[in-house]
């Protein structure tokens, strides 16, 4: 067995597992009454948009090119450098290191091709829609595609560093500043730079990122972190499905490195008054602060609706705000119930007044906070309309 055979075997197993997850959720009734009508609706709206009519055409005329840049920014946050490593591979590192190295190189090539496929799909779907309104030529759009693809690969190479190194507040702030500078600089380059220079920047980003990624691939010092990240990538779709289910749950893929919480260390109390109600509330808030998955879910939901609000016309902003307030409260309810379903809380009385009072209070506090952020984004977006 060589690295190429091992790669294709694990790639097939990966997609087979994802297909089983989708098959478990989408049976023939769901496909017949929900999925197929949704696909037909999207195709119908796309044809109307191509012909210059329909609801989406009016929305795109108001939003102009801002919605496209928002979509590009969201794509930048997706993807990762795959390795297809497993915990059992550590046994072969001493004797068959070359096979693991070949596996990681093929996985790196697959990650680049998957990223390129995303941008090509967006390119061929969006180009016919904006060519008549933005007045962009095929050569200019190709240069833009080259730049965005190179920038995305550069972000993926930076994500490799975050996986290998322990997380900290200073590192998170630095990474956020780098992303903000690159996004702002990209907007300036896209608007004011000629297509040849824009394509050159994209090629430089791609060349630099490939060299960095190849060096990281040849190293085995972060084997445990890469295995953990691979588990998260494999379970991402299943976790998205299970997040909406109260009866089912996904096992959390934990990092082996022990980290101290940033807030309320050493079990420091949040509430001075100790009652059954405050005990439930303190448990829930500490889990929300220390469990990155729950915080990430709420952050992704808020980010998606914030972008939608910024690029939408006024009437669609109102609809987005109403939808977000309902979805946010529903997800917070699911999270609270999952937290309280922990094994050490089996003997607690979940039918008591204190439990329901704490449940309502916790959900209301976070719901009002997230809704306020969304309303603030809507107010700021009105300044640019």
From Swiss-Prot:
Keyword Transmembrane carried by entry: yes
Entry keyword annotation includes Cytoplasm: no
Family annotation (InterPro entries): EcsB_ABC
Localisation: Cell membrane
Bilayer topology term: Multi-pass membrane protein
Domain of life: Bacteria
Transmembrane segments annotated in the record for this chain: 24-44, 67-87, 106-128, 133-155, 176-193, 197-214, 304-324, 365-385
Gene Ontology CC annotations of this record: plasma membrane
Signal peptide location: none
Annotated keywords: Cell membrane, Membrane, Transmembrane, Transmembrane helix
Pfam family, one: EcsB
Name of the protein in question: Putative transporter YthQ
């Amino acid at each position: 067995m060589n690295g190429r055979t091992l790669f294709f075997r694990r790639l097939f197993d990966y997609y087979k597992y994802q297909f089983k997850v989708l098959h478990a959720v989408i049976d023939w009734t769901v496909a017949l009454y929900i999925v197929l009508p949704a696909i037909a609706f999207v195709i119908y709206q796309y044809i109307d948009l191509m012909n210059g009519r329909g609801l989406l055409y009016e929305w795109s005329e108001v939003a102009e090119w801002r919605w496209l840049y928002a979509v590009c920014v969201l794509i930048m946050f997706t993807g990762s450098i795959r390795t297809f490593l497993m915990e059992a591979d550590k046994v072969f590192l001493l004797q068959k290191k070359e096979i693991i190295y070949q596996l990681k190189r093929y996985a790196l090539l697959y990650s680049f091709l998957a990223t390129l496929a995303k941008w090509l799909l967006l390119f061929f779907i969006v180009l016919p829609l904006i060519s008549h309104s933005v007045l962009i030529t095929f050569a200019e759009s190709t240069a833009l595609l080259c730049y965005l693809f190179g920038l995305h690969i550069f972000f993926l190479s930076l994500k490799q560093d975050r996986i290998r190194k322990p997380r900290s507040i200073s590192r998170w702030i630095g990474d956020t500043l780098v992303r903000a500078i690159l996004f702002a600089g990209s907007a300036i380059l896209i608007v004011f730079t000629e297509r040849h220079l824009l394509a050159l920047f994209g090629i430089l980003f791609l060349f630099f990122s490939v060299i960095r990624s190849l060096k990281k691939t040849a190293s085995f010092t972060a084997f445990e972190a890469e295995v953990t990240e691979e588990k998260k990538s494999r379970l991402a779709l299943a976790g998205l499905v299970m997040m909406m289910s109260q009866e089912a749950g996904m096992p959390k893929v934990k990092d082996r490195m022990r980290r101290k919480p940033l807030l309320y260390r050493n079990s420091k109390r949040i509430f001075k008054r100790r009652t059954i109600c405050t005990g439930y509330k303190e448990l829930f808030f500490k889990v929300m602060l220390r469990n990155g998955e729950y915080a990430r879910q709420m952050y992704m939901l808020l980010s998606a609706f914030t972008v939608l609000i910024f690029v939408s016309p006024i009437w669609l902003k109102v609809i987005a705000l109403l939808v977000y307030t309902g979805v946010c409260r529903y997800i917070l309810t699911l999270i609270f119930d999952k937290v309280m379903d922990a094994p050490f809380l089996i003997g607690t009385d979940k039918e008591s007044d204190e439990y329901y009072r704490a449940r309502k209070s916790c959900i209301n506090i976070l719901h009002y906070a997230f809704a306020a952020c969304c309303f603030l984004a809507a107010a700021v977006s009105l300044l640019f309309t």
